[in-house]
Design a protein with these regions (language model features):
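Accessory, non-ATPase domains that flank or precede helicase/AAA+ motor cores in DNA-metabolism machines
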Residues: 1-160, 173, 180-348, 352-363, ...
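Serine residues within intrinsically disordered or low-complexity segments
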Residues: 159-167
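Glycine-rich, charged/polar anion/phosphate-binding loops
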Residues: 264-266, 366-369, 408-413, 446, ...
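Short, hydrophobic beta-strand segments
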Residues: 351-353, 491-496, 504-510
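Helix N-cap motif at beta-to-alpha junctions
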Residues: 500, 508-517
């Protein structure tokens, strides 16, 4: 009796609105890696699901070329996370797979598999040598070499053994999330990082895994300096600045279920966590969490909360000044608020228009800023916007001869820090905030909160002082968004042109039960060479 063929849908790292079906040589499980052909090209794909009754006739279904037992399986939690990203951010599963397993990562896995094959061949040869007759000294040497090979092989295949020994796709209990009533906890204030430590200690003491996200590598560096003294070798870094080998080793460690504290940028969300207990999102308000190109164009904060839900993990968010999205969730009691007592330094706002009217400007410097610098001691950091650095440095040297005056951009400040500056002065704050963005006032409040982390005395020169004065509270801004139907009270979906990113249409969708259907309708009407961007920030 002929064997009944088995069919599976295989996810490929290409943009397809459908998942191809292939004939499998044997029963395969979701997450297994396979080699298939599509359009005369070979791909390493992932088994998405079994298919009992394929839509195509059997003679039109291609066979799987090989099962990649040498590559690690994709976990059930990873597959669920990919499905969330594709569904929420209106992209294809193939685009998510390509982001989660980019070419460099796949090559690194292949390299590891090749090395493992060579090591196993060397081990077999060493065992053959040991089976012969030798004197005691030769036997000791061969035995030591064999044991070294065994240890090296164990380092490459421990994750696969862990995958096979556990129950694939076993759902996590929600004990960590349930302890907080299932709600993410928000820590606000300049010292919010200190509030993360007890939760990290507790998770690691239980032998579990922790993810700490930062918006940029610059924040990773400062967070590493904060965490490394206490958590030492348990701390694993994961971002684009790490080598493929370093990133693969981190992935293997997590896949094996070993306790670890991972510190990374949004790409760390795609790691194969096996026992994730805690997700921390630092500086949750930072727009750098939003992926713009390529798809999936996801927001790291929101994706991290979804990932935590899949794993049943606890969530902590930290910010000096929160995003309005987080504030809305606090006010609607979806999130729990735990303020941190230490306030950020309050900025002194200087009205450039008023200074200009009373001849209070000397080049790019207001009289108030000049007086503040002259009355202070210690280094001064000037945060430039439109100003040319050479011209600004020349002005500073003329006005403050002999003073330690440094000039940086906002990006450099985040990356390098303020170098112990006593004063941090923003030369033209309006250059750092888009005037045409409905989020401008929110961004201004968040900018001041971020600057307060770097220096004790902040001065801000601006042509729009009301924006930076702090007179309008975040609750006022949230009420205004509600009145005019802007996010976060609605969902913004933009239709953009592929390549240029030009905005063709803007859709403000209500946050109700019709949201999913409205998003699906936009996808169905998508024209060639266009794409949809959900929750854009620029």
């Amino acid at each position: 009796m002929a064997a009944v063929p088995t069919y599976v849908q295989v996810l490929l790292p290409v943009k397809l609105r459908w998942i191809p079906t292939y004939a499998a040589p044997a029963a395969l499980e979701p997450g297994q890696r396979v080699c298939v052909e599509l359009g005369h090209r070979r791909y390493d794909g992932v088994v998405w699901c079994r298919q009992e009754r394929p839509e195509l006739p059997p003679e039109r279904i291609q066979p799987i070329l090989s099962v990649r037992e040498d590559l690690p399986r994709v976990t059930a939690e990873e597959l669920r996370f990919w499905a969330f990203l594709a569904d929420y951010y209106l992209c294809t599963l193939g685009e998510v797979y390509k982001a989660a397993y980019p070419l460099l990562k796949t090559r690194s896995e292949q390299t590891a598999a090749d090395i493992l094959t060579r090591l196993q061949a060397r081990l077999e040869k060493k065992n053959q040598q040991l089976s012969g007759k030798h004197n005691e000294r030769v036997i000791q040497r061969l035995t030591a070499e064999r044991d070294a090979l065994l240890a090296e092989i164990a380092g490459y295949c421990h994750s696969e053994r862990s995958e096979e020994s556990g129950s694939f796709g076993k759902p996590q209990d929600d004990k960590d999330g349930a302890r907080d009533g299932g709600k993410p906890q928000v820590r606000l204030g300049a010292a919010h990082r200190e509030a993360f430590l007890p939760a990290i200690r507790e998770a690691l003491a239980a032998g579990r895994q922790v993810l700490v996200l930062t918006p940029e590598i610059a924040f990773c560096d400062s967070m590493e300096a904060f965490l490394r003294p206490e958590f030492g070798p348990q701390l694993q870094l994961f971002h684009s600045g790490r080598t493929p080998v370093q990133r693969r080793h981190t992935a293997e460690r997590l896949r094996s279920g070993v306790s670890a504290l991972v510190l990374g940028t949004r790409s760390a969300l795609f790691l194969p966590f096996r026992d994730l207990a805690l997700v921390i999102i630092d500086e949750e308000q930072d727009p750098a969490y939003k992926q713009t190109e390529p798809a999936p164009r996801y927001h790291g904060r929101d994706a991290a909360i979804a990932l935590a839900g899949i794993h049943g993990a606890r969530v902590l968010l930290g910010a000096t000044v929160p995003s309005l999205e987080t504030l809305l969730n606090i006010r609607s009691e979806k999130y729990a608020l735990a303020p941190v007592a230490t306030p950020a330094p309050r900025a002194e706002v200087i009205d450039l228009a008023a200074e200009r009217r009373k001849n209070g400007l000397v080049g790019n410097f207001s009289r108030k800023l000049i007086d503040a610098v002259r009355q202070s001691s210690g280094p001064v950091l000037l945060l430039r916007g439109w100003e040319k650095p050479e011209a600004l440095q020349e002005e500073a040297d003329t006005l403050f001869p002999g003073r330690d005056i440094r000039i940086k951009t906002l990006a450099a400040l985040k990356r390098e820090g303020a170098d112990g500056a006593a004063i941090l002065a923003v030369m033209q704050a309006d250059a750092l905030i888009s005037r045409d963005d409905f989020r401008a006032d929110e961004r201004a409040a968040q900018l001041l909160g971020t600057l307060g982390l770097f220096a004790p005395h902040i001065l801000v020169q601006t042509g729009v002082p009301a924006r930076f004065s702090g007179e309008r509270s975040l609750d006022d801004l949230l009420a205004e968004r509600q009145q005019f139907g802007f996010p976060p009270c609605t969902r913004l979906v933009e239709l953009r042109r592929q390549g240029s990113g030009e905005i063709l249409e803007r859709h403000f969708l209500p946050r109700d039960r019709s949201l999913a259907a409205r998003k699906a309708d936009l996808v169905s009407r998508l024209a060639p060479n266009t794409y949809l961007d959900v929750d854009p920030l620029d």
